[in-house]
Amino acid sequence: MAKYMISGSKGGSKKPYVPKEMEDNLISINKIKVLLAVSDGECDPDFTLRDLYLDDVPVIASDGTVNYEGVTAEYRPGTQTQDYIQGFTDTSSEVTVARDITGDNPYVISVTNKNLSAVRIKILMPVGIKTEDNGDLVGVRVEYAVDMAIDGGSYSEVMRDVIDGKTRSGYDRSRRIDLPKFDERVLIRVKRLTPDSTSSKVTDKIKLQSYAEVVDAKFRYPLTGLVFVEFDSELFPTQIPNISIKKKWKIINVPSNYDPISREYHGSWDGTFKKAWSNNPAWVLYDLVTNQRYGLDQRELGIQIDKWSLYEAGVYCDQKVPDGKGGTEPRYLCDVVIQNQVEAYQLIRDICSIFRGMSFWNGESLSIVIDKPRDPSYVFTNENVINGDFQYTTASEKSMYTQCNVTFDDEQNMYQQDVEGVFDTEAALRFGYNPTSITAIGCTRRSEANRRGRWVLKTNLRSTTVNFATGLEGMIPSIGDVIAIADNFQSSNLTLNLSGRVMEVSGLQVFVPFKVDARPGDFIIINKPDGKPVKRTISKVSADGKTIELNIGFGFDVKPDTVFAIDRTDLALQQYVVTTISKGDDENEFTYSITAVEYDPNKYDEIDYGVNIDDRPTSIVQPDVMAAPENVKISSYSRVVQGVSVETMVVSWDKVPYASLYEMQWRKGDGNWLNTPQTANKEIEVEGIYSGNYQVRVRSVSASGNASPWSKIATATLTGKVGEPGAPINLTASDNEVFGIRVKWGMPEGSGDTAYIELHQSPDGTVENSSLLTLIPYPQYEYWHSTLPAGQVVWYRIRSVDRIGNVSSWTDFVRGMASDDVESVLGDILDKIFDTEAGQEIKENAIDSANKIKDQAQSIIQNALANDADVKWTRVQNGKRKAEYGHALELIANETEARVTQIEELRASIDGEITSSIKTVQEAIATESETRATQIQQLDSKFTKEIDGVRKDTSASISDVRQTITNESEARAQAVQQLDAKFTKEINDLDGVIKTEVEANISEVKQAIANETEARVQADQALTARFGDVESALVEKLDSWASVDSVGAKYAMKLGLTYKGQQYSAGMVMQLSQGSSGLISQILFDANRFAIMTSSTGGTFTLPFVVENNQVFINSLLVKNGSITNAMIGNVIQSNNFVQNQQGWRLDKNGIFENYGSTPGEGATKFTNEGLKVKDANGVLRVEVGRITGSW
């Protein structure tokens, strides 16, 4: 039997699958709609969802990743005509439909109402469940779409949506379909895209529950930037997210030549603007000031702002500087949101602080200055500052900050506030740790925050303030301008002369009145007439320091007394920024006080580029003891000058620290030490030396005047010129020059090393009586010796002295004489007379002088009588007879003056031809610039009568004016009186009108003047009488003055006639004055006859002195010294000790000359036309020549 293996397994129970049901996840969701007003005014139109941030996360990232689904947004740039945002807010009318939407049965909504803005559909899914094969209950997915056909056109899809999830209780959602513009109708078709389910396991029907016809409110909000954001509430279930937008914002006015994207300025700006986006702080400021919606000009006052200074600031802000990461960036940007109302002044200051600016009102407009590199606009020195006084104030060390913590909005961290610390190590070593903090307005870059902090530290460390007062030059600089200050007190404690006023500028040479401590390579700065300083390089300075030569001329006319300053290579001018300018009060209205703060021109490269530049010192600190020069060397060289070999000694030495000048002394053999002019060089040349042994020593001098000990004496034997200098040749002295002698000479060949000519004078041509007259610089070849009396004789001799003190031999004496030619002397005196005021006075005829005085008096009277006061009249009339009284009283007090005027006038007349009047005017005026008091009295009478063709007019008047005037610079008092009497007769006959005029006039003008430059008193009086064509005048003029450049007195009395068309004159003028022409003391007479008369007790007159028709007659004359060109003897000429036949001498008109000597009884001599006779002491005739008579 076969065996079978039976096998099997143990049976058991398997746990059955339990179906699962997912939770309902289709829940009706609300839409979040947010409308943000993001800007007042037009903004840049570009906007995408990449610019929109929800809780600091962009809706769409820069790489295109969508961070938030279902977010929509609309943007309006804030234009005047912008469209409204659809869907916010609206009114609607809902229509119930409750129709299933299947793939074969879409639903069409017809819209014909053109006022509708949109149609809002509501889709309902009553149940959305799917049963899986394993019994699980899950959600369904149904996709649907909305098509639109416009005015009979074809359908196009406008929206596609999907419902994905599970719901048992039903789920609905609303979707807005915006309507376009149409003419007739719009068809909206709602269709199902997911095929309809045929399985009982799937329940996914959808239906159009209803639709609403929507009319938007259509609020455009013109000129307001808008952002509308819409998203499902499920994205942020707990709270509304923080919504922010990062984009270009405001469109503002920018220059027409400006590209805000590349930040470049093309060509020159014509002052016009265009609209564009910009975050340049200068143009942001311009918008804030000029905008009439939200800016400073909301009242539409037309606020003026200096756009040219803003242009300068804008260009500076856009310049590229290192960004600290290897690239570049604009220097300053303004990324700021102004959300609240703020004070305008504070806002302007905050915006200006972005670009280191300062705002001020310049009298016409709001002006902006920025702290940037700039040249000084004017130079102030001790010369053009009142009292030469600069007052300095230095801040406390506590305010010297060494660390600055800058708070800014970091763009790399979603504009969260951060702090950038800036530390100055060098300052901390000096002042310690001293922090400060600032908030950087509009700053979003860490690199810019660092620059702002560095600027705070560098600027604050230069905190010295200067105050000074000046004259009208204070009107030249403006707030924010850089000025240069040359203060000899501050720079060198008066040890250096580095500023002053020029005497003259000629070509490349500048002449100054004192020694200037300038050197070649230094700079001289001069203020141009328009105020702008001009700098030129110095090529050479004369030995006396008074002549400066330039490399290049100034190119404009430099007036004398123009201020200059020296900018040395080792000592810079101080520079300051003007912060305030204030005008003086009434007493000092032409003075200006200026306050300025220290300016550092080197800080900008350190702030922007981190470059440290060593500053030149503005003051010098020198050692008390100077070192002596070392390595003193002596050498020589020769050169040929005009065929003559000239040897030159050269002395050199090493430079000494802190030395500004050097002094050298030398001597030949054992002679005296000779000085050379101080020099800033390390070498001196002595030209024209002679052969011999020379010794030299040198010492250094500091700028403060400290001198070192002399160096060791250096010795050398040099081969130079042999012998002595050549003596001058051809010495002459004139004898035909009036009141002087002209001395001339020549020089021999080889005299090029001559330094000067030594001129001696002698009254008699002897060495014993000679004396030094003067030293004449070579190569001058003549000398004018004046003033000498006519006929004076002087003897002269000269010798030459070379540059190193060697002297030539003396020339022989030559004789010179001041001319004794009377005709030449009188001609010269006459020319000098007419060059003086007295000469011009006596030259003018008295009638012309009288007319000038008369016209001056009438002008003063008429000007004083001019008055527009309203005179009230009282009149009484009886027929042709009229009596009138006028009176005016006027009182005025207003913003510019106080004035009181009183006028009183009395008139009496008959038929208008016989009149008499008295007028009195009194007036007192006080204004801000002048006071004036005037008193006038005028008496006037007129009589006119005509009988039988003969008309006679007579008039008489007296005018009297008293006036005082004072103002800030002058006081004046005037007294004018004029008496006038006239008679006119006219006869009408067949031949015409015969007119005769007779007039007598006295005019007197007196005035006293005192002002800043002179005091003067004048009294002029003129008496004139005229009958027809015949006229006479008497004039008396008194004048006394004292001024800054002259002092003197003058008196004139003149007579004048006009007779038969010819003028005649007589007069006298006296003048005594001292001025630029020297002392003038003279009395001048104009007369055909000038006589001095004496009278006796019996009434007899004699004439001791008479000038008649150009001849002088003298009755008796005693002359000590006299010179006669031609003389005639009318009787005899004899010595004053003459005694007939005893002593003295005598020459008579018959030609007999007798000479008895000075002692009686010593013999005698007698000359006649017939012979010569001599007798001895006993009276015996001893000699007889010619005709022999044998008797005396």
Swiss-Prot record:
Its main localization is virion
Could you tell me the keywords of this UniProt record? Host cytoplasm, Host-virus interaction, Late protein, Repeat, Ubl conjugation, Viral attachment to host cell, Viral attachment to host entry receptor, Viral genome ejection through host cell envelope, Viral long flexible tail ejection system, Viral penetration into host cytoplasm, Viral release from host cell, Viral tail assembly, Viral tail protein, Virion, Virus entry into host cell
UniProt PTM? Ubiquitinated by the Bil antiviral defense system; about 20% of CTF is ubiqutinated when the Bil system is expressed in E.coli MG1655 and infected with this virus, or when this protein is expressed in a strain with the Bil system.
User: Residue ranges of the Fibronectin type-III domain?
Assistant: 628-722, 727-821
Q: Which residues form a coiled coil?
A: none
Q: Where in the cell is it found?
A: Virion; Host cytoplasm
Report the protein's function: Attaches the virion to the host receptor, inducing viral DNA ejection. During tail assembly, initiates distal tail tip assembly. During virus entry in host cell, strongly binds to host receptor in an irreversible attachment. The binding induces structural changes in the tail leading to viral DNA injection.
Family the entry assigns: Belongs to the Caudoviricetes tip attachment protein J family.
| Subunit comment | Homotrimer.
Q: What is this protein called?
A: Tip attachment protein J
Which source organism? Answer: Escherichia phage SECphi27
